Design a protein with these regions (language model features):
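Short, amphipathic alpha-helical interaction segments positioned at domain boundaries
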Residues: 70-92
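Short amphipathic alpha-helical interaction segments
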Residues: 36-51
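Minor-groove-contacting beta-hairpin "wing" of winged helix-turn-helix DNA-binding domains
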Residues: 62-68
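Short alpha-helical segments that sit at the start of domains
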Residues: 1-20, 36
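A short, conserved structural fragment
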Residues: 50-60
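Short acidic, hydrophobic short linear motifs in intrinsically disordered regions
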Residues: 19-30
């Protein structure tokens, strides 16, 4: 399920106008896609994506803002593959 959550996060970030979302918004969106997780699990997902260079995370108080990188956009759009991230389907 982590692979699905990771690609979902990347696709969400790729589709918003400023390519960034706060942790709470990401949690809500994952829930809408039946991929809900605990806040600790979400922090781990975001940290893993940041370690892979797919997003950057900026701490804001007790939360953080995630922003997709160019590499993350390539993965979200199926132009690059990263082990641990589900390959996106051809249909969006």
């Amino acid at each position: 399920m982590r692979e699905h959550q990771r690609i979902c996060i990347l696709r969400m970030l790729d589709q918003v106008p400023d390519y960034s979302m706060n942790e709470s918004m990401i949690a809500d969106e994952l829930g809408r896609w039946a991929l809900a997780c605990s806040r600790d699990q979400l922090k781990s997902l975001l940290a893993w994506l940041a370690e892979q260079g797919l997003i950057t995370c900026e701490p804001i108080g007790h939360s953080q803002i995630a922003r997709i990188t160019q590499r993350g956009q390539d993965v979200a759009n199926g132009l690059a593959l990263v082990p641990g991230v589900k390959r996106p389907s051809a249909v969006r």
